[in-house]
Amino acid sequence: SILLIMSLTISSQVSTDNSIHQFKVADISGNIFDFSELKGKKVMIVNTASKCGLTYQYESLQKLYSQYKDLNFVIIGFPSNDFLWQEPGSNDQIMDFCEQNYGVTFPMMSKIKVKGSKKHPIYQFLTEKSKNEFKDSKVTWNFQKYLINKAGKIEKIIAPKTRPDSEEIVSWITNGD
């Protein structure tokens, strides 16, 4: 019975957080970015690429971030080279590109895999219902958007071609919790 009590104690100490807030990842400068600091904020996670037909969305993403960041909204960019090698640069090159061409100030993370067997754990969470309790999904292209509520749960998955400043997204940012 002592063994049973010990195993119950150990299992109760294991994190059962099934929100985005459980993650710590490297940002584009190599520093740790702790998603638990986003509790109480709405979050858009978007996989990005510098040489894509949708790269122009950086401009809309930055405008959206500038306009709504004071309303507890944040955009997190995850560069990825998973779609036709459209993000070949290093983290430094990606950041320079984003700053010089689009004035990006929203948080950018280190380049990761968003699909396949080496998919980053945060994208495993975003795409697997067993981890996110919302739905299974696939990242279909660069600039797919995941809208995360203040509790760290996925509420919407937005197609890559949908502009960041679309009515659907703006309405989600500005309405309710």
At which residue positions do the language-model features occur?
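Bacterial Sec-dependent N-terminal signal peptides
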Residues: S1-D17
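Proline/glycine-enriched tight loop/beta-turn segments at coil->beta junctions
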Residues: L38-V43
